[in-house]
Curated annotation (Swiss-Prot):
Propeptide: 1-2
Post-translational modification: The disulfide bond which can form in the large chain dimeric partners within the hexadecamer appears to be associated with oxidative stress and protein turnover.
UniProt binding sites for Mg(2+): 201, 203-204
Residue(s) carrying N6-carboxylysine: 201
Protein name from the UniProt record: Ribulose bisphosphate carboxylase large chain
Source species: Coffea arabica
Phylogenetic placement of the source organism: Eukaryota, Viridiplantae, Streptophyta, Embryophyta, Tracheophyta
């Protein structure tokens, strides 16, 4: 923004426009332990210096506006303003920079992810001086983390509730996602659960449509999982989607699920909103319900490399808002996810303390100060041949969710579930014996299929299926000349 002649007002106020960098670019600033730190990928318009672009981001996401205002004199800008304290060029990209911004903690309401994102990723993303802007990462200080409840229960409490240890959990999204009657839907749930799955799932699209109202679905699914529990002796769950058009209706559905005695409900946290999600998470903790989170709409926000917000930031926001599971990509399936980047935000979901590691896209060290962890869910285009890779990549604290990879079995839902359970148990056994899942995965599956006709049939159906597309979300590297 070009400087403009300042006009001196009669009370000593200097009106006019001045460059943002004069106030908001402070390379000498030493960050505080209580600051929220943000790493923005900034693409300035031609002719806009990177320092001015970074300062504009700091200003417009904190105390600044396009012109000086006389009310600036009524507060302490030095106390409340955001500061761009460091800028570095992005390797391999022309006119693209990482701008680091520090925000004083007093700018944010305690316990409100909604308020945090309203400030940091608000109007600044439409700022004309920038061609594009992407929030790559946040460092949320312990002082702010401690104002959040976080996940309703967390990983260890969920395992204790389910009495399941030492392996990933298995799930399945019921298909077709739309169009089934409630009774037929419940039948599909029962077949999958009795075949050996731990969970089945409402699709994110399923709320309360004319072909299947929510109350009918809840009742038939509860009947299905209780019947499967009685037959198998294992605790079962179905993610009943409580997402609704109002927060009041959402809570009403969660209350009904609790009255049915089911263990888990579900929410679409981005389309539903962080305020609704946090309210539901609080209800779930108070009433003993696990909370599964779907990330529908995330790719609208995080898919583009130079604009929007990286999923690792959305994942941090979810852990603060509250959820016991969240979909996190597969690395090997049909949906977006490069291995190093995916494992970076998987660790941010599960672990208590994560060191800065730019090789995995982690810009800041993050201390969660004992906030419960979130189980990542691998879902989308996966089948039995992927089981060794998924077990090796995600480890035990994960949910491996096979929708078409269960319901597409040539013999039906229950045999599809059997095939997945046998494949998983074979991979866990092989891993515990010291075998290399990455190198011997196909052999492990073939060996297991000799003793399971259901697995053998699944192996035959999906032996040629591949999703060989290059990931859009990749680490920054110098380009070859």
């Amino acid at each position: 923004m070009s400087p403009q002649t300042e006009t001196k007002a009669s009370v000593g106020f200097k009106a006019g426009v001045k460059e943002y960098k004069l106030t908001y670019y402070t390379p000498e600033y030493e960050t505080k332990d209580t600051d929220i730190l943000a790493a923005f990928r900034v693409t300035p318009q031609p002719g806009v210096p990177p320092e001015e672009a970074g300062a504009a981001v700091a200003a417009e996401s904190s105390t600044g506006t396009w012109t000086a205002v006389w009310t600036d004199g009524l507060t302490s800008l030095d106390r409340y303003k955001g500061r761009c304290y460091h800028i570095e060029p992005v390797p391999g990209e022309e006119n693209q920079y990482i701008a680091y911004v520090a925000y004083p903690l007093d700018l944010f309401e305690e316990g409100s992810v909604t308020n945090m994102f309203t400030s940091i990723v608000g109007n600044v993303f439409g700022f004309k001086a920038l061609r594009a802007l992407r929030l790559e990462d946040l460092r949320v200080p312990p002082a702010y983390i401690k104002t959040f409840q976080g996940p309703p229960h967390g990983i260890q409490v969920e395992r204790d509730k389910l009495n399941k240890y030492g392996r990933p959990l298995l799930g399945c999204t019921i298909k077709p996602k739309l169009g089934l009657s409630a009774k037929n839907y419940g039948r599909a749930v029962y077949e999958c659960l009795r075949g050996g799955l731990d969970f089945t799932k409402d699709d994110e699209n399923v709320n309360s449509q004319p072909f299947m109202r929510w109350r009918d679905r809840f009742c038939f699914c509860a009947e299905a999982l209780f019947k499967a529990q009685a037959e198998t002796g294992e605790i079962k769950g179905h993610y009943l989607n409580a997402t609704a058009g109002t927060c009041e209706e959402m809570i009403k559905r969660a209350v009904f699920a609790r009255e049915l005695g089911v263990p888990i409900v579900m929410h679409d946290y981005l389309t539903g909103g962080f305020t609704a999600n946090t309210s539901l998470a609080h209800y779930c903790r108070d009433n003993g319900l696990l909370l599964h989170i779907h990330r529908a709409m995330h790719a609208v926000i995080d898919r583009q490399k130079n604009h929007g917000m990286h999923f690792r930031v959305l994942a941090k926001g979810l852990r603060m808002s509250g959820g016991d599971h969240i979909h996190a990509g597969t690395v090997v399936g049909k949906l977006e996810g490069e291995r190093d980047i995916t494992l970076g935000f998987v660790d941010l979901l599960r672990d208590d303390f994560i060191e800065k590691d730019r090789s995995r896209g982690i810009y800041f060290t993050q201390d969660w100060v004992s906030l419960p962890g979130v189980i990542p869910v691998a879902s989308g285009g996966i089948h039995v041949w992927h089981m060794p890779a998924l077990t090796e990549i995600f480890g035990d604290d994960s949910v491996l969710q096979f929708g078409g990879g269960t319901l597409g079995h040539p013999w039906g839902n229950a045999p599809g579930a059997v095939a997945n359970r046998v494949a998983l148990e074979a991979c866990v056994k092989a891993r515990n014996e010291g075998r290399d899942l990455a190198a011997e995965g196909n052999e492990i599956i073939r060996e297991a299929s000799k003793w399971s006709p259901e697995l053998a049939a699944a192996c035959e159906v999906w032996k040629e299926i591949r999703f060989n597309f290059e990931a859009m979300d990749k680490l920054d590297k110098e380009k070859d000349l």
